[in-house]
Amino acid sequence: MTVASVEQMFSGKIQVGSEVTVRGWVRTRRDSKAGLSFVSVSDGSCFAAIQVVTPAHLPNYETEVRKLTTGCAVIVIGTLAPSLGQGQQFEIQAQSIEVVGWVEDPETYPIQPKQHSLEFLREVAHLRPRTNLFGAVARIRHCLSQAVHRFFHENGYYWITTPIITTSDAEGAGQMFRVSTLDLVNLPRTETGGIDFSHDFFGKETFLTVSGQLNVEAYALALSKVYTFGPTFRAENSHTPRHLAEFWMIEPEIAFADLAEDARVAEQFLKFLFKTVLEERTDDLAFITERVEKTTISKLEGFIKSPFERIEYTDAIKLLERSGKKFDFPVEWGLDLQTEHERWLTEKHIGRPVVVTNYPEHIKAFYMRLNDDGKTVAAMDVLAPGIGEIIGGSQREERLEMLDIRMAQFGLDPTHYQWYRDFRRYGSVPHAGFGLGFERLMVYVCGLSNIRDAIPYPRAPSSAEF
């Protein structure tokens, strides 16, 4: 007898006529006039559930099988057979059904066999993976996570695990969560009345990381090609459907690379991810295309086929100014591009993904390399139709004197970044990298309208349940 997953059965890995054991949860059950029950069982291994044909002569048919409701856990032993019903390839002809776990009160069970609103499902995030949509999202998230590691491994990168607790603000924006074990009722004070963090666990003020980039640069300058992929945190009090307080970031870093090489890798990387998910999660993407976003599959296929357009920020501003379109946000050299500007460029004017380069120095981070014009930095944003910015990156400032000037402009204390300055003192080389918010990627692939649906347990202002 073979313990088999539903995915193995539908992919032909289990021979028809084999005796199998399947373990999963009931989606639906219905009785027939012929004295049978049809129980739909899902184990989460793929989008589909398998129909279990249950005859009335089973010893627990009346006492248990006919009382099964959505969510009950069962172990089924039976024979895999071609299905006589429409819309399904196989079924299991049951020899026994063991009920492992009952749903305590079927009437109040939150996940009923009907369509629920996304707002409601966020309130029961611990149960929402049992729905069709969030089961699909979870499998796609796994597929893309594995594809991230596969791409970098196959291209000679090393995965570096960067710290979650840090003393540095990688973005220089100050939107950080403080980490402390101090007694909030009896805080130690300095002579000037400030909090004395020398009494804290680490002996200094510490935070949750906003980016692994600064740390991973150290390894790029020793191992040449590296990346980090882990959780990051931003204490940005934003309630929009585009922001999370906790999210995952993919950040490669490449030694001896300039901005052009950075953009080339970003394009290659995104196309690899989309090609992989199209090949490996066909069933889940088909459901999303049917129920969530009808252009999902064609959008990803078009992205893969399209060469990325390259355009400088200055030229992008000129195009927007000449567009004749009235935008909600002003278009002016020196201001950052907003989502509406990015989407106009990719969807209305150019019609494919765009890499915008060389932004004004005052709207980008301190570590980005100052260009020879003294006004712009070697920064890039990859813009995608339907979402806008999906990747942000830059060539890093490898010149110590210029880095110090940039840090001073941002009001950063150089003593907190002495270790980062060391990279420029000892064998400095040009290097570049980018960041891709994993949940932003998930939103794009799955056609989601709210980023809180792209992560298992969303963390946002006034929201830290489960």
From Swiss-Prot:
List the InterPro entries hit by this protein, alphabetically: Aa-tRNA-synt_II, aa-tRNA-synth_II, aa-tRNA-synth_II/BPL/LPL, Asn-tRNA-ligase, Asp/Asn-tRNA-synth_IIb, NA-bd_OB-fold, NA-bd_OB_tRNA
**Can the keyword Membrane be found in this entry's annotation?**
no
* Family as reported in the entry's similarity comment: Belongs to the class-II aminoacyl-tRNA synthetase family.
Q: Which UniProt keywords apply?
A: Aminoacyl-tRNA synthetase, ATP-binding, Cytoplasm, Ligase, Nucleotide-binding, Protein biosynthesis
Question: What species is this protein from?
Answer: Xylella fastidiosa (strain 9a5c)
Chain ranges passing through the membrane:
none
Using the UniProt record, name the top-level EC class of this enzyme in a single word: ligase
Name recorded for this polypeptide: Asparagine--tRNA ligase
Q: Which reaction does it catalyse?
A: tRNA(Asn) + L-asparagine + ATP = L-asparaginyl-tRNA(Asn) + AMP + diphosphate + H(+)
EC number annotated for this UniProt entry: 6.1.1.22
Q: Name one GO molecular function term.
A: nucleic acid binding
The record's PROSITE patterns line, in alphabetical order, gives: AA_TRNA_LIGASE_II
